[in-house]
């Protein structure tokens, strides 16, 4: 195998993963958010010039609705083009202010007025104008939308592709179990058309699932008569009638097969088939060989056959028999009498030529096209009287106009493919040559001119009858070739189109007035319906979800979701087993592992790592080409339909050095089956072993050793991991951690290469390489502002930390700063913990987890959660609410954290119940209690007309205030605190801009210096003509005076001029940007109606790990912390090192997730190698020895492994730096389905000088005694999940009651009580605890008088109770009375 050396970037050199993969990667992991980003980019086509836009997205929607003509046709509104403006607020400002991030859409339309008087269409005048059509939400670069200040994701939908589908009822409709076949034409929008057989083999049709009609009615409405229908669907046998006796059949031998004749079949004198014998294929061959053209048959052979045409007496014109009649003896006699010499009959038999259409015609009541149209009208609009025009229009609008019916390009492609046509393109309406030829409007003439003699509806019925006849197969609805993905862009386009159609109706009404009243396009178009439709879709559609933002992985997974639910999709209740099941076509397209547990199982899926959608929306997966057994590196993407024709080998098929398949029989997949094929018959091969799984499943190491159900839990639980205080890379990973972190957008990556110029906790400044600097005003400085301590959707903390130092040389794409759950640019969801598998005093019973106190002490699982609390001051009927520190009846101590405006200080530590924002509400006059009267008498009026409605810290929460935002309505004066916040914000922005400008300026001057030093000058400040410009001279000059230099060299002179222009341009630009920012900060805020002021307070809550918190590994091994034990009591190793976590060994065998054991072994080896490197560094070993040891770790089995690590690229200093980063453990990658083998794990343990069994002797921390046997010990990456006991634990003494039942509310959110439910009542009944039970049902619950009295009694020290009537009983009595049953209680 050739050595595959990769060159390492600045970031990658810091820490290298040892990769155990045997397969070299053909494809890099693609951009993981492409499905979202690309789809929306196509929808907007923002960076495409208007005249070059493709027929997609907004452009397509606008083109499909415009031009709009008035009813009279004298005025029309035409579409010219559109452009998107600049968003008013950027993403950060939208999040802060609770706005939606979007840009205004301006559409250019042209109003054309035609001259009424002229006979031809002469244009009277034209007016072109730009019309505002509302805000279009913009996607952030991470594939999300910001709607009302929160990040949302539009999930892609997997729905049934438009086209035609053939199916049967699986024998469920009829008691006999007969299969009833059906066909359904599903358009992209418009009416569904179904065809179905009934148990008597007649064909029916339904429109939009209404009542069924015989299919001949539909064909008659299209303009076919009985003879034409029969000719389309049947082959005709021709009989010549002899004038006196007998009949001659024009013989087609094939058609006789399977019949039994009651006369001898002879060729001349030679009998071929005797009477009563069945005719076989051999007989047919003999007949063909004999060349028999006509066959004399008796009359009764013709009787009972079905006529294919009307029979008319030639002389009198009398109708002797109708098409589709069964010929009787009388009719045959009449034919002879009238001198009819030939008749045609339908060739039918019971086996494979059923008389279905013939049966249908017998039950069809209609005779003419008009009758058929009326019948369809009655079915669609029952109870309305039909007129000829109405019936014709209704039928035409159902399937034949683009306004009402659209198959779409996908639908047409699928339709043509299924009915066996070669061409892919076609009309997006149903086309029928005969129907359109009879109409004479422009559109119909165009269609007829462009198309061949085809009929879509006839062809579907033909395929359906063929399937019924036993030729052809039905479709599998769950095949991914019949389901397609609808992404954001397409859904937004549909919604936009719906809005436009609503606008179109209104415009049509107004267009008639446009001419007389001289209206402009702006007055004609009302943008509200479009804006409303879009807002509704992004804000409250079923597929617009609140983004799951627990950690970077959950963001990426959420955007790669594919849901079968949603508008036009399935519903949970109706979805059966088949839809939810794994289908062979899921391979490489949709993850076979990751799906939710519960009611949505199988309906919500995740895209596989390499999957993408093609132009039609079908999922494709990449394969390597194989030619004559040689595997090439050419990659082809195949959809599920295309894949059907090929034999595909697995990714791990054995190949030799020349890439030839070596096995005699290769395990392959073909048409959904697994089989063995010789190498010559293989067409394709998988690109990667992780092709079948999604991102989350591909992050589970040793996935191949886990049971599928546990792997599913493992993949799902990784998404719930909370980012810890200090992230730790997993010691055992799979090698795609870096790709996930990169694409999730939580890290800061360098846009261009360069040198780090300046850095602090919140900002990184890069001076860009000369080569990467663009022209114009680009000054070559990139400034990255980091996100500090902001709140995610799940209240976890988002914070970015710089990874670089001043002077570091970086390249494009390098990681400059880590985000939440990332460690040097790699995904790091949990912590590497030292784990022992052993029982410990019952503390790990039933998956419980025993923790060491050291874990808590070192803050390994301490997480920061940020809570947002909002206080709103409204205008009430009694006057405005007021935010102030002057609150009645509140102690001085309770207000000591508030400033004079009544808002809490930043940095204050608050506990449950503390006031954070003081607010008073005016209250109406009420009956005063004697105490209040006394107070009034003493203190005067003021004390009682306001009540305290301050924002307090909710129960069970304490933390530190980290940010306060005050929003004030426009036109209301800002308070002191708001002004302070505003000033500090303006200061911050100014400093940012000043720094940026200073750095830009310095960069421009530095570049200019390099261009003019050493050149000859023609003069300048203190410089003679002919002198050279030197560094010293420039240092002595004021920067602004450099521009007075006059250079001899033209290039140098140009450079000075260019630099001056650049600096002036930047100065202007910065001033404008600062003015804009300042304006936004100082302007009033757009608040909800009736809101005067809003204060948002952000609390940072620190949560340590504690009993009751849920934790999990990556293999579905989840548990709850049962106890935290002192370090000295934990089991310890011979070295004296205590373990961190003790897990129950019984959790492994029955769950069959052995991956965790292998992870523990390999993790131990990784840690051991790190310790060995640490010892070498401490002993100051020679660099060459360290290099040799690292080479041994990374490349010892490079004969079988794919990638080698080239350590010669590292300088000694870089190597030492790498060594320092490996002290914590050498990270390993064992890719999914291609991971480390047992031998390799043992080899690593050996290198680390650890026992190869992976087990060691542990000692009891309490007694110091050795345990009876050795224990499996090692490092596992363990996660803390977002199911924290602090969020779930809840207690209440007094609190809110429900008004009707007078019982406490339920649930933590309502601060509710504990329900003493029916099972608890049964328990007390069973014990006979009558008094306790009475107390529970009355005074402790809803007996109002009793509980008030009880309170007084306790205060007075009398411990007795009087139980009265529970309020819920009164409610019951009232409900019974509402049923008009009187019920009274008697003493």
Swiss-Prot record:
A Pfam cross-reference name: RNA_pol_Rpb2_45
Cleaved signal peptide residues: none
Domain of life, source organism: Bacteria
PROSITE patterns, sorted: RNA_POL_BETA
Catalytic activity: RNA(n) + a ribonucleoside 5'-triphosphate = RNA(n+1) + diphosphate
GO terms of biological process kind: DNA-templated transcription
GO CC aspect terms: DNA-directed RNA polymerase complex
UniProt keywords, alphabetically: DNA-directed RNA polymerase, Nucleotidyltransferase, Transcription, Transferase
Keyword match Nucleotidyltransferase: yes
Stretches assigned to coiled coil: none
GO terms for MF: DNA binding; DNA-directed RNA polymerase activity; ribonucleoside binding
EC number(s) from the headed UniProt entry: 2.7.7.6
Keyword Transmembrane part of the UniProt annotation: no
Membership in a protein family: Belongs to the RNA polymerase beta chain family.
Function: DNA-dependent RNA polymerase catalyzes the transcription of DNA into RNA using the four ribonucleoside triphosphates as substrates.
Quaternary structure and partners: The RNAP catalytic core consists of 2 alpha, 1 beta, 1 beta' and 1 omega subunit. When a sigma factor is associated with the core the holoenzyme is formed, which can initiate transcription.
Protein's recorded name: DNA-directed RNA polymerase subunit beta
Gene that produces this protein: rpoB
